[in-house]
Protein backbone atom coordinates (compact mmCIF):
# COMPACT_ATOMS: atom_id res chain seq x y z
CA UNK A 1 0.00 0.00 0.00
CA UNK A 2 1.28 3.44 -0.91
CA UNK A 3 1.67 5.57 2.19
CA UNK A 4 0.32 8.94 1.14
CA UNK A 5 -0.02 12.00 3.34
CA UNK A 6 -3.65 11.31 4.31
CA UNK A 7 -2.93 7.67 5.28
CA UNK A 8 0.14 8.69 7.26
CA UNK A 9 -1.74 11.36 9.22
CA UNK A 10 -4.63 8.98 9.92
CA UNK A 11 -2.29 6.24 11.15
CA UNK A 12 -0.34 8.69 13.28
CA UNK A 13 -3.53 10.04 14.85
CA UNK A 14 -4.76 6.53 15.74
CA UNK A 15 -1.40 5.64 17.27
CA UNK A 16 -1.38 8.84 19.28
CA UNK A 17 -4.85 8.13 20.63
CA UNK A 18 -3.83 4.60 21.66
CA UNK A 19 -0.74 5.84 23.47
CA UNK A 20 -2.58 8.71 25.09
CA UNK A 21 -5.42 6.59 26.54
CA UNK A 22 -3.48 5.26 29.57
CA UNK A 23 -2.19 8.75 30.27
CA UNK A 24 -5.69 10.19 30.27
CA UNK A 25 -6.81 7.54 32.77
CA UNK A 26 -3.75 8.06 34.92
CA UNK A 27 -4.43 11.81 35.00
CA UNK A 28 -8.10 11.27 35.96
CA UNK A 29 -9.35 11.18 39.53
CA UNK A 30 -8.57 7.80 41.19
CA UNK A 31 -11.73 6.02 42.31
CA UNK A 32 -12.09 4.14 45.59
CA UNK A 33 -15.27 2.18 46.29
CA UNK A 34 -16.10 1.00 49.81
CA UNK A 35 -18.72 -1.73 50.28
CA UNK A 36 -20.30 -1.54 53.72
CA UNK A 37 -21.14 1.53 55.78
CA UNK A 38 -20.51 0.24 59.29
CA UNK A 39 -17.82 1.60 61.59
CA UNK A 40 -14.98 0.18 59.47
CA UNK A 41 -16.25 1.11 56.02
CA UNK A 42 -17.51 4.55 57.00
CA UNK A 43 -14.23 5.39 58.75
CA UNK A 44 -12.18 4.29 55.73
CA UNK A 45 -14.36 6.28 53.33
CA UNK A 46 -14.28 9.38 55.48
CA UNK A 47 -10.53 9.56 55.95
CA UNK A 48 -9.65 8.70 52.36
CA UNK A 49 -11.91 11.52 51.17
CA UNK A 50 -10.74 13.90 53.88
CA UNK A 51 -7.00 13.25 53.67
CA UNK A 52 -6.91 13.23 49.87
CA UNK A 53 -8.56 16.68 49.83
CA UNK A 54 -10.75 15.75 46.90
CA UNK A 55 -7.99 14.16 44.83
CA UNK A 56 -9.56 10.71 45.27
CA UNK A 57 -13.18 10.02 44.36
CA UNK A 58 -14.74 7.94 47.14
CA UNK A 59 -18.03 6.04 46.83
CA UNK A 60 -19.62 4.21 49.77
CA UNK A 61 -22.20 1.51 48.99
CA UNK A 62 -24.55 0.81 51.90
CA UNK A 63 -28.21 -0.30 51.74
CA UNK A 64 -29.41 1.29 54.99
CA UNK A 65 -29.82 5.02 55.55
CA UNK A 66 -29.10 4.91 59.29
CA UNK A 67 -26.33 2.94 61.01
CA UNK A 68 -27.02 1.82 64.57
CA UNK A 69 -23.92 1.08 66.60
CA UNK A 70 -23.72 -2.20 68.42
CA UNK A 71 -21.31 -0.59 70.86
CA UNK A 72 -23.31 1.32 73.50
CA UNK A 73 -26.45 -0.62 72.50
CA UNK A 74 -26.42 -2.37 75.87
CA UNK A 75 -26.94 1.04 77.47
CA UNK A 76 -30.21 1.25 75.56
CA UNK A 77 -31.26 -2.11 77.01
CA UNK A 78 -30.37 -0.85 80.49
CA UNK A 79 -32.37 2.34 80.00
CA UNK A 80 -29.40 4.73 79.89
CA UNK A 81 -29.73 5.67 76.21
CA UNK A 82 -32.48 6.10 73.64
CA UNK A 83 -32.43 4.27 70.32
CA UNK A 84 -31.89 7.55 68.50
CA UNK A 85 -28.63 7.98 70.42
CA UNK A 86 -27.26 4.92 68.63
CA UNK A 87 -28.30 6.00 65.14
CA UNK A 88 -25.98 7.76 62.70
CA UNK A 89 -26.95 9.03 59.27
CA UNK A 90 -24.54 9.29 56.33
CA UNK A 91 -24.92 13.04 55.92
CA UNK A 92 -21.57 13.68 57.57
CA UNK A 93 -19.79 11.48 55.03
CA UNK A 94 -21.48 13.30 52.16
CA UNK A 95 -20.30 16.63 53.58
CA UNK A 96 -16.75 15.23 53.50
CA UNK A 97 -17.06 14.54 49.79
CA UNK A 98 -18.07 10.87 49.92
CA UNK A 99 -20.59 9.76 47.31
CA UNK A 100 -23.03 7.59 49.30
CA UNK A 101 -25.03 5.05 47.30
CA UNK A 102 -27.87 3.41 49.25
CA UNK A 103 -28.13 0.04 47.56
CA UNK A 104 -26.97 -3.57 47.92
CA UNK A 105 -23.70 -4.57 46.29
CA UNK A 106 -24.48 -7.92 44.66
CA UNK A 107 -21.32 -8.69 42.70
CA UNK A 108 -17.78 -7.62 41.89
CA UNK A 109 -16.22 -7.92 38.44
CA UNK A 110 -12.50 -7.94 39.22
CA UNK A 111 -11.50 -7.81 35.56
CA UNK A 112 -13.72 -4.87 34.64
CA UNK A 113 -13.25 -3.34 38.12
CA UNK A 114 -16.93 -2.68 38.70
CA UNK A 115 -19.38 -3.35 41.53
CA UNK A 116 -22.88 -4.47 40.48
CA UNK A 117 -25.84 -2.99 42.36
CA UNK A 118 -29.11 -4.72 43.22
CA UNK A 119 -31.05 -1.78 41.82
CA UNK A 120 -29.29 -2.06 38.47
CA UNK A 121 -26.16 -0.51 37.07
CA UNK A 122 -22.63 -0.70 38.39
CA UNK A 123 -20.00 1.47 40.04
CA UNK A 124 -16.44 1.54 38.61
CA UNK A 125 -13.40 1.52 40.87
CA UNK A 126 -9.63 1.60 40.83
CA UNK A 127 -9.33 0.32 44.40
CA UNK A 128 -11.98 -1.61 46.32
CA UNK A 129 -12.47 -1.92 50.08
CA UNK A 130 -14.74 -4.69 51.37
CA UNK A 131 -16.17 -3.98 54.81
CA UNK A 132 -19.58 -5.70 54.86
CA UNK A 133 -19.52 -6.66 58.54
CA UNK A 134 -20.72 -10.01 59.86
CA UNK A 135 -24.02 -11.86 59.80
CA UNK A 136 -25.51 -15.24 60.57
CA UNK A 137 -25.45 -18.19 58.22
CA UNK A 138 -28.86 -19.82 58.28
CA UNK A 139 -28.67 -23.36 59.67
CA UNK A 140 -25.13 -22.96 61.02
CA UNK A 141 -26.28 -23.55 64.61
CA UNK A 142 -28.23 -26.78 65.26
CA UNK A 143 -31.80 -26.01 66.26
CA UNK A 144 -31.57 -22.35 65.29
CA UNK A 145 -32.60 -20.55 62.11
CA UNK A 146 -32.89 -16.97 60.93
CA UNK A 147 -36.63 -17.18 61.56
CA UNK A 148 -35.93 -17.98 65.22
CA UNK A 149 -34.30 -14.60 65.80
CA UNK A 150 -37.76 -13.04 66.01
CA UNK A 151 -38.57 -15.26 69.01
CA UNK A 152 -35.04 -15.38 70.48
CA UNK A 153 -33.39 -12.07 69.52
CA UNK A 154 -29.61 -12.05 69.55
CA UNK A 155 -29.27 -8.27 69.10
CA UNK A 156 -25.74 -8.81 67.77
CA UNK A 157 -26.67 -6.30 65.06
CA UNK A 158 -28.08 -3.16 66.60
CA UNK A 159 -31.39 -1.78 65.39
CA UNK A 160 -34.63 -3.74 65.20
CA UNK A 161 -33.11 -6.69 67.08
CA UNK A 162 -32.11 -4.45 69.98
CA UNK A 163 -35.59 -2.94 70.11
CA UNK A 164 -37.13 -6.42 70.07
CA UNK A 165 -34.94 -7.62 72.94
CA UNK A 166 -35.85 -4.62 75.07
CA UNK A 167 -39.54 -5.05 74.25
CA UNK A 168 -39.33 -8.66 75.44
CA UNK A 169 -37.71 -7.52 78.69
CA UNK A 170 -40.46 -4.98 79.21
CA UNK A 171 -43.16 -7.60 78.63
CA UNK A 172 -41.66 -10.20 81.00
CA UNK A 173 -44.06 -11.26 83.75
CA UNK A 174 -43.10 -10.33 87.28
CA UNK A 175 -40.81 -13.02 88.63
CA UNK A 176 -40.07 -14.34 85.14
CA UNK A 177 -36.76 -15.78 83.95
CA UNK A 178 -34.29 -14.24 81.52
CA UNK A 179 -31.89 -16.75 79.91
CA UNK A 180 -28.81 -15.84 77.89
CA UNK A 181 -26.25 -18.03 76.12
CA UNK A 182 -22.73 -16.62 75.91
CA UNK A 183 -20.79 -17.81 72.85
CA UNK A 184 -17.59 -19.87 73.08
CA UNK A 185 -14.24 -18.29 72.19
CA UNK A 186 -13.23 -16.75 69.91
CA UNK A 187 -15.78 -14.07 69.16
CA UNK A 188 -15.69 -10.44 68.21
CA UNK A 189 -16.43 -8.62 71.48
CA UNK A 190 -15.31 -10.60 74.57
CA UNK A 191 -16.94 -8.33 77.19
CA UNK A 192 -20.18 -8.01 75.20
CA UNK A 193 -22.28 -10.77 76.84
CA UNK A 194 -21.33 -9.64 80.34
CA UNK A 195 -22.01 -5.99 79.61
CA UNK A 196 -25.39 -7.04 78.29
CA UNK A 197 -26.39 -9.23 81.21
CA UNK A 198 -25.28 -6.45 83.59
CA UNK A 199 -27.59 -3.99 81.83
CA UNK A 200 -30.40 -6.57 81.84
CA UNK A 201 -29.85 -7.05 85.58
CA UNK A 202 -30.03 -3.29 86.12
CA UNK A 203 -33.28 -3.04 84.17
CA UNK A 204 -34.86 -5.97 86.02
CA UNK A 205 -33.73 -4.66 89.40
CA UNK A 206 -35.57 -1.42 88.70
CA UNK A 207 -38.64 -2.87 87.00
CA UNK A 208 -38.94 -6.59 87.82
CA UNK A 209 -37.00 -7.20 91.04
CA UNK A 210 -38.19 -10.78 91.55
CA UNK A 211 -37.07 -11.90 88.07
CA UNK A 212 -34.27 -14.45 87.66
CA UNK A 213 -31.30 -14.43 85.28
CA UNK A 214 -29.64 -17.59 83.93
CA UNK A 215 -26.41 -17.39 81.89
CA UNK A 216 -25.20 -20.49 80.05
CA UNK A 217 -21.50 -19.97 79.36
CA UNK A 218 -19.25 -22.68 77.82
CA UNK A 219 -16.03 -20.85 78.76
CA UNK A 220 -14.17 -21.97 81.90
CA UNK A 221 -13.30 -18.38 82.80
Where are these regions (language model features)?
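N-terminal secretory signal peptides and thylakoid transit peptides that target proteins
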Residues: 1-15
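Short, well-ordered coil/turn residues at beta-beta hairpins
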Residues: 11, 131-132
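Beta1-alpha1 glycine-rich phosphate/pyrophosphate-binding loop at the start
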Residues: 27-99, 184-221
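A conserved short coil-to-beta-strand element within the FAD-binding core of flavoproteins
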Residues: 103-112
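Core beta-strand elements of the Rossmann-like FAD/NAD(P) dinucleotide-binding domain
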Residues: 119-127
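Glycine-rich dinucleotide-binding loop and its adjacent helix/turn
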Residues: 132-208
